[in-house]
Amino acid sequence: GFIGWGNNIFGHYSGDF
């Protein structure tokens, strides 16, 4: 997801709250 800590392979934030 877009909200959370760390970047995923797409360059967006991962780990939705």
Curated annotation (Swiss-Prot):
Anantin has been tested for antimicrobial activity against a broad variety of bacteria and fungi, but no antibiotic activity has been found. Inhibits the binding of ANP by 50% (IC(50)) at 1.0 uM. The keyword Secreted applies. Keywords: Isopeptide bond, Secreted. It is found in: Secreted. The keyword Secreted applies. This is Anantin. One of its GO terms (cellular component) is extracellular region. Competitive antagonist of atrial natriuretic peptide NPR-A receptors. It binds competitively to atrial natriuretic peptide (ANP) receptors from bovine adrenal cortex and inhibits the ANP-induced intracellular cGMP accumulation in bovine aorta smooth muscle cells. Can also reduce the increase in cGMP produced by ANP or BNP (brain natriuretic peptide) in pregnant guinea pig myometrium, but has no effect on relaxation induced by either peptide. Blocks the ANP-induced human sperm acrosome reaction without affecting the acrosomal exocytosis or sperm motility. There is a cross-link at G1-N8 (Isoaspartyl glycine isopeptide (Gly-Asn)).
